[in-house]
């Protein structure tokens, strides 16, 4: 039995539906919102509604945007001969934070996972192949996650694009910067050895 008002209990319940938010965190968030001044609560609710209403998928790369095509696709300074394929819009943010990649992106919104009933048709592979039909793209960097689903997706895509004459590369996996070899598992060490480069 909960010891607080029904509207607070409803708010806790809604917060708990968010990923990574358990009961205690949901309770903390609910009480924080209740204690905010009314104008801050209003701003928060307006921001949530605006984000939901105005955000859509870019018609070119499938990234989240409020402008179509997105600024990355319409930017004139990007290298349009290279596309980095990622699973999730958050991966684009991570790649952009490195300030190293200057090409374009393609967001799949998932990975092939037969165990979860997700096949190639359920993610945006067809749209990628359509983009490659223009002939402008010379390389596709497969930056899917380094797990079974990500590897399967990368292999599937590489086989599809090989006949198109587009170079397929895979991001290297291995030891994180500052990590100790003794704590790395065998798979990570093997991937680090595979992905080694000349210095």
UniProtKB/Swiss-Prot annotation:
Keyword Metal-binding carried by entry: yes
Gene3D superfamilies associated with the record: 3.30.60.80, 3.40.1360.10, 6.10.250.240, RecR Domain 1 (1.10.8.420)
InterPro entries assigned to the protein according to its UniProt record, in alphabetical order: DNA_Rcmb_RecR, Rcmb_RecR, Rcmb_RecR_Znf, TOPRIM_dom, TOPRIM_RecR
Superkingdom of origin organism: Bacteria
Location of the Toprim domain: 81-176
Record-linked Pfam families: RecR_C (PF21175), RecR_HhH (PF21176), RecR_ZnF (PF02132), Toprim_4 (PF13662)
Zn-finger region bounds: C4-type: 58-73
GO biological process: DNA recombination; DNA repair
Alphabetically ordered keywords of this record: DNA damage, DNA recombination, DNA repair, Metal-binding, Zinc, Zinc-finger
GO molecular function per UniProt: DNA binding; zinc ion binding
Protein function: May play a role in DNA repair. It seems to be involved in an RecBC-independent recombinational process of DNA repair. It may act with RecF and RecO.
Recorded family membership: Belongs to the RecR family.
NCBIfam families from the UniProt entry: recR
Stated name of the protein: Recombination protein RecR
Species, as recorded: Ruminiclostridium cellulolyticum (strain ATCC 35319 / DSM 5812 / JCM 6584 / H10)
């Amino acid at each position: 039995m909960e010891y607080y008002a029904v509207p607070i209990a409803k708010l806790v319940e809604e917060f708990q539906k968010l990923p990574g938010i358990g009961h205690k965190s949901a309770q903390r968030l609910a009480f924080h919102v209740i204690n905010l001044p009314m104008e801050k609560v209003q701003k928060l609710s307006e921001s949530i509604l605006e984000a939901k209403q105005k955000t859509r998928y870019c018609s070119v790369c499938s990234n989240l945007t409020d402008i179509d095509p997105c600024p990355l696709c319409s930017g004139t300074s990007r290298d349009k001969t290279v596309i980095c394929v990622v699973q999730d819009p958050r991966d684009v943010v991570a790649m952009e934070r490195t300030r190293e990649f200057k090409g374009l992106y393609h967001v799949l919104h998932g990975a092939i996972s037969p165990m979860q009933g997700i096949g190639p048709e359920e993610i945006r592979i067809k749209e990628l192949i359509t983009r490659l039909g223009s002939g402008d793209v010379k390389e596709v960097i497969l930056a899917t996650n380094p797990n079974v689903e990500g590897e399967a997706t990368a292999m599937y895509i590489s086989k599809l694009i090989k006949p198109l004459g587009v170079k397929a590369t895979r991001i290297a996996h291995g030891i994180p910067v500052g990590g100790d070899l003794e704590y790395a598992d065998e798979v990570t060490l093997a991937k680090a050895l595979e992905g080694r480069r000349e210095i």
